[in-house]
């Protein structure tokens, strides 16, 4: 699999299980790009929804994607600390055009004190039935959710102290 080069700008595209484009983030800067891990950053980035509406992100963010895990993690740097938004999703693929993944609706919001909240369980159930998620996918997603929660509790990976700050410092060297 090809991987994006550090310093390059790529778009990030999330899809739904049925193949429909869900959301696109334009111009994220790649800070690390390997076959297994991609770390990107963006600030005041244009986001385009599937219905054509668009908005601009409000704060700098560090985005973590892994080819093995069924989740991605966005660390948002705000005045009162780092907030994380975690998407339960397929592992990423990079096709030379964009970083792509399937969004499976379940999300976890993590607060600066590392407490967290599971979001969108109702949306997950609705889409699971509507798009007929296979039972094996449902099982994988719930197993991966448990791994993600373990990472949060253990301060592992992007949740480790200084991870987001250190990558943000790297991002500033590209500006």
Swiss-Prot record:
InterPro entries: DUF402, FomD-like_sf, Ntdp-like, SA1684. Its EC number is 3.6.1.15, 3.6.1.6. It comes from the Bacteria. The active site is at residue 23. Coiled coil: none annotated. SUPFAM superfamilies: FomD-like. GO terms for molecular function: magnesium ion binding; nucleoside diphosphate phosphatase activity; ribonucleoside triphosphate phosphatase activity. This is Nucleoside triphosphate/diphosphate phosphatase. It comes from Oceanobacillus iheyensis (strain DSM 14371 / CIP 107618 / JCM 11309 / KCTC 3954 / HTE831).
